A protein has these predicted regions:
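Structured interface patches
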Residues: 1-172
Length: 172
């Protein structure tokens, strides 16, 4: 059974140096504004796997894994999209170890799991959220969805006005 938490005190695990634990936790995940659109994780509480290891010289090595769907509009055609995002990230927090060995999600032995999950999801987002990879998007001239219109969808282009005088030429 999953525990419900977003702030987790690692000292409650009572790990000794070199010891580790794997936990299944439910974490609230906030939505994203991406490309001017709003995307919501579904479900709003993601089940995450947290692996915690106590390091020999103090501090923790952490691994976070989660998978969730994001619901929102396709960036190409505006139809509903629901891609699944998988996350597998690691953090190290070693007191006195310098900036590279200090996790921004740790305050002493307290881990802000919700912030870490949110940031990890944000970094795992694809360049475009689409309803399907083959989505052709919308016609830039009329706005029709190109997947529905088919390959025969075309528009006559207006002739370039700079060439207008050539149309006035009469050949006999």
């Amino acid at each position: 059974m999953s525990a419900r938490t977003h702030i987790f005190d690692l000292d409650t695990l009572r790990l000794t140096a070199g010891e580790g634990r794997r936990l299944s936790l439910e974490v609230p995940v906030q939505g994203f504004s991406f490309g001017g659109q709003r995307y919501q994780p579904v479900p709003a509480r993601a089940t995450v796997t947290l692996e915690v290891s106590r390091m020999t010289h103090g501090g923790y090595a952490l691994r976070l894994r989660l998978e969730t769907a994001l619901e929102g509009p396709c960036m190409r055609c505006l139809e509903p999209a629901s891609p699944t995002i998988s996350v597998d990230v690691r953090e190290v927090d070693q007191p006195g170890g310098g900036e590279e060995l200090t996790s921004p999600y740790m305050d002493g032995a307290v881990l802000d799991l919700a912030a870490w999950a949110h940031d990890a999801l944000a970094l795992a987002l694809p360049a475009q959220i689409v309803c399907r990879e083959e989505c052709a998007g919308l016609c830039p001239l009329c706005g029709e969805r190109l997947d529905d219109a088919g390959p025969e969808h075309r528009h006559e282009r207006a002739p370039d006005p700079r060439w207008g005088k050539l149309r006035e030429l009469k050949f006999e």
